[in-house]
A protein has these predicted regions:
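Hydrophobic h-region of N-terminal signal peptides that target proteins for export
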Residues: 10-18
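Positively charged n-region of N-terminal signal peptides that target proteins for export
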Residues: 1-4
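Acidic, serine/threonine-rich low-complexity disordered tracts
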Residues: 20-111, 117-120, 125-217
């Protein structure tokens, strides 16, 4: 059930006006998504973003628990920290427990490349590579990425499906629907709906063909 693993939040950062004499105060954003499989809530995805001057720090936490007849059949836990400066990734760290399989990813930036240690294996990436952690809508404009869980390289293809009206928690949203998929490994696929620049729903299909939705509270 690898495809249940979710790091689903896409958010747009507000513009922070700079003061004439003093640095702009940090802007902080907190969002929570409820993850639902069928009629059952199976987890949450939370994100905290702090934008201060030219630096953005991001903390993502995802918890998923699937139970069958009151017995836990699957658990997924993921934490991720990112630091961006002037639009460039400078540090990344994630820890994942995918139903007992654990991963540790650390990325640092050098002047002309990114240096990654993924589960004890070292590799170098171009500076254009970025984690497909889905907290920024910029993901639909980039195709060179890596899996935030495993560090696996990904090439993202985006399909523009068009406009749709969705009702979430009783509130109608005029949304734009995109599909994104990894063309290298083929395992990663998501449907994303935005109201303006803000993600309101994500859908994936589980390995058992169940529909899994992540809706903004």
């Amino acid at each position: 059930m690898r495809t249940i693993a979710l790091s689903l939040t896409l958010l747009t950062l507000p513009v922070v006006p700079a003061g004439a004499d003093n640095p702009a105060a940090a802007t902080k954003i907190h969002k929570v998504f409820d993850i639902v499989r069928g009629n059952d809530k199976i987890g949450t995805d939370t994100i905290d973003i702090e934008h201060e001057n030219d630096t953005i720090t991001v903390k993502v936490k995802t918890d998923v628990s699937v139970k069958v007849m009151y017995i836990e059949a699957y658990r997924y836990e993921h934490t991720c920290n990112e630091t961006w400066k002037n639009g460039q990734l400078v540090a990344f760290k994630s820890r994942t427990n995918d139903n007992g399989t654990k991963h540790a990813i650390d990325v640092t930036a050098a002047p002309d490349k990114l240096s990654m240690d993924a589960d004890g294996k070292h590799s170098e990436l171009p500076k254009t590579a970025a984690p497909v952690s889905l907290w920024s809508k910029d993901v639909i404009h980039k195709n060179d990425g890596f899996d935030p869980d495993t560090g696996k390289r990904m090439a993202i293809k985006v399909t523009d499906v068009g406009e749709e009206v969705l009702t979430i928690h009783g509130t109608p949203h005029q949304t734009h629907h995109y599909k994104i998929a990894d063309t290298l490994g083929g395992e990663f696929a998501r449907d994303l709906w935005y109201d303006g620049d803000v993600l309101v729903r994500t859908k994936i299909i589980g390995s058992d063909n169940s529909v899994i939705l992540s809706d903004l509270r």
